[in-house]
């Protein structure tokens, strides 16, 4: 890597009131403009404004700290109604959930589904 050569180093320019934009404004407009902006015969180039419009207002009261919003109400876990219990006999249940009986077994022998052929395994022979 290359390091910066000291011959190319330039320090930052120092602030000078002569190069201030206020000083340039003073030179352009003359003495009447100096008194208007307050940097005339008093010797300084800037001063704190003392007019009524620049004064701070009286401190008011601070607003309250922000609060976390309340969580929405959870659904009620308590039962608000009576549960009606029904008692049914087995015949009534079978009638409600009736399934057709399975088909009777056939006397013809069904063909066996074909088995997929066995996979061949390769065996490595040692010492041949």
Curated annotation (Swiss-Prot):
GO molecular function: protein kinase inhibitor activity
Biased composition (Pro residues): 99-116
Predominant subcellular localization, coarse grouping: nucleus
Subcellular localization(s) per the UniProt record: Nucleus
Region described as Disordered: 23-76, 96-128
Any one GO CC term of the record: nucleus
Keyword match Cell cycle: yes
Entry keywords, A to Z: Cell cycle, Nucleus, Protein kinase inhibitor
Keyword Ribosomal protein: no
Function of the protein: Probable cyclin-dependent protein kinase (CDK) inhibitor that functions as a repressor of mitosis in the endoreduplication cell cycle.
Name this polypeptide is given: Cyclin-dependent protein kinase inhibitor SMR1
Species annotation: Oryza sativa subsp. japonica
Lineage: Eukaryota, Viridiplantae, Streptophyta, Embryophyta, Tracheophyta
Gene: SMR1
